[in-house]
A protein has these predicted regions:
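Small/polar/charged residue-enriched interaction surfaces, especially the RNA/DNA-contacting tracks
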Residues: 1-171
């Protein structure tokens, strides 16, 4: 015996959204942003390998005060992070000379950092006098690299200060 079964009809709603197509300009902009992000990541990784992982850098940065690194950061920021100018070299040489002539504790602790930065980032030999002016070339990549590196240095200084405070509270 068979019974007829009535089934409800299923309603299917198709929700078609209009597809947004990416323009050529938008595509190029997106690709440039992705490339910039990968460059930033690469700069950070290279900086970590060449400086942060090395004992010499850790020892130099450990003692500098936050006020000194902030001052140095603002000097570079004022120069738009272009380290190719003589102004930065003059600033570093002045800080090293001031440390030798004054008894400022902050400068005394910052001197090794200034010497390290001058030697490894600018190629300055503090034992020799400055003789010639540099030829300044400004590129977006170099400025971006300098800004990222100095931001990483500043962050590492903050890390060292926080670590010191935690260790002193733990004892």
């Amino acid at each position: 015996m068979s019974c007829p079964v009535k089934r409800k009809q299923k309603e299917v709603k198709l929700n078609f959204k209009p597809k947004n197509y990416e323009t050529v300009d938008a595509f190029q902009k997106r690709i440039e942003e992705e490339a910039k992000e990968s460059k930033t990541k690469e700069i950070k990784q290279n900086f970590k390998k060449s400086h942060i992982d090395k004992k010499e850098f850790q020892e130099v940065v450990k003692e500098i005060s936050l006020s000194q690194i902030t001052r140095f950061y603002s000097v570079l920021e004022y120069r738009n992070f272009s380290t190719g100018s003589d102004y930065i070299e003059d600033f570093l040489r002045e800080q090293v000379k001031r440390e030798e002539t004054t008894n400022d504790k902050d400068l005394e602790k910052a001197k090794p950092f200034y010497e390290y930065y001058g030697k490894h980032f600018l190629g300055i030999d503090f034992n020799k006098d400055k003789t010639e002016k540099k030829i300044v070339t400004y590129t977006k990549e170099a400025i971006l690299k300098n800004e990222i590196e100095l931001s990483l240095i500043k962050a590492y200084v903050r890390y060292c200060i926080g670590k010191k405070r935690l260790e002193s509270e733990g004892n």
